[in-house]
Amino acid sequence: MKRETVTSARNPLLVHLKKLLAARSYREACGEFAADGTKLLEEAAKWYPGLETVVVQTGVELCPLPEHVRVVEIPESLMRSVSQMEAPQGAIFICRLPEARPAALRPGTLLLDGIQDPGNLGTILRTADALEVPVVLLDGCADAYNPKTVRATMGAVFRTQPVRMTRAEAVQSCRAAGISLLATAMSADAVDLRKKNLSGCAVVIGSEGRGVSAELFAAADGKIIIPMNPRCESLNAAAAATIVLWQMKC
């Protein structure tokens, strides 16, 4: 595959790439996102039809790429200036953002309410992909296409597309489909999740600091709790989601 060569940090492609890595608003305005790393590139080349451009460091071997993909070679010094990684792997790439899908829920869906940490969000998406559970991102969630989120998914974001909804849309969709909405909670009236059949429900995981929003608590058909040692105050959002996801598959 023929490679173009760029040697200037002022090149429009590199300026564009740095903006994609830095700002959600720019990603959404352009309809593109960028990711960093050779392993992620392998996953994108294998699973994601929206792969558009690869920027590769001189001397770095690339995985097989689709014929339509543009390949641009840059020196190591430029790769270090563009990459957000402390030890760049030598490949950064640009993809189209996926087209928005119709907002509709089905039984056995995990709803994420205000998960703001990109690492936690990426870990949850990775686990959900492994267990084949659909995920909906509600108000206040981190960007699924933030570079940190994408890295934490380990490529899962290229295989499954999380849907975005407002809280009101999620509640309305549950009601329309006859799906029970359950909220995770640290409260005395919450039911041990092992006593519930979660496969036919939509389950809400709340933010790391505030938990499930008051709006969704008020709309929920019930509350569930992960039983744990009373000395422990709470679980990390990604850890809690992993337990809920496993229970949804049982």
Q: Regions from the language model: what does each represent?
A:
Residues 64-65, 81-83, 148, 172-173, ...:
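Short, charged, surface-exposed secondary-structure boundary motifs
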Residues 182-232:
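Active-site/ligand-binding-proximal alpha/beta "capping" segment
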Residues 59, 76-79, 140-142, 208-210, ...:
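Short, acidic/turn-prone active-site loops that include or flank metal/cofactor-
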Residues 1-118, 139:
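Arg/Lys-rich RNA-binding interfaces used to dock onto structured RNA substrates
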Residues 46, 98-187:
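RNA substrate-binding interface of SAM-dependent RNA methyltransferases
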Residues 74-75, 113, 138-140, 161, ...:
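Short beta->alpha connector loops at strand-helix junctions that form conserved
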Residues 3, 32, 71-73, 162, ...:
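Conserved beta-strand scaffold positions in the cores of enzyme catalytic domains, especially
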